[in-house]
Amino acid sequence: MTEVLVVADCWQREPDSEAVIQRAVAAAAESVDEDVADAEVAVMLTDDAGIRTLNSNWRGIDKPTNVLSFPALQPEGGWKPGDAPRMLGDIAIAYETMRREADEEHKPFEHHLSHLAVHGFLHLIGYDHEDEDEAEERETLETQILAHLGIPDPYADRDGTH
């Protein structure tokens, strides 16, 4: 189950955001492991000021970003299929940064929002991008999940490798 909490008025411009996030997180959960499909995720829709505060407080980076993930449980060695906790964690998405990226990349708002929700969800279950191999694995999985939703590969125009 995904709970969406809107804490910034700017999200009112996109009334379908909650449904987009629900669908994206459900697709990600189902594609990874059946046990995860029943776990809880909270998604906070905030603005650049809100996510900047979170980024500064939790990561020591004093600037806004598009999405942050806060896993509820991070077992040593990473999450394993079948070991999903009841509450996976929280995701925060910043409206202005997300909107700007979508516009700059000529992507529909809903597609980019879906991508960030999937990206954030995968972080909750241990997928990372600290090195090139991890990033490639996560990007491949993101692309597969988004394709299931009818969304084109978000990385296709970047380097032509997907």
Show where each model-derived region lies:
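Extended, folded domain segments that form the structural surfaces/walls around functional sites
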Residues: 116
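An acidic/histidine-cluster motif and surrounding catalytic segment
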Residues: 1-113, 124-162
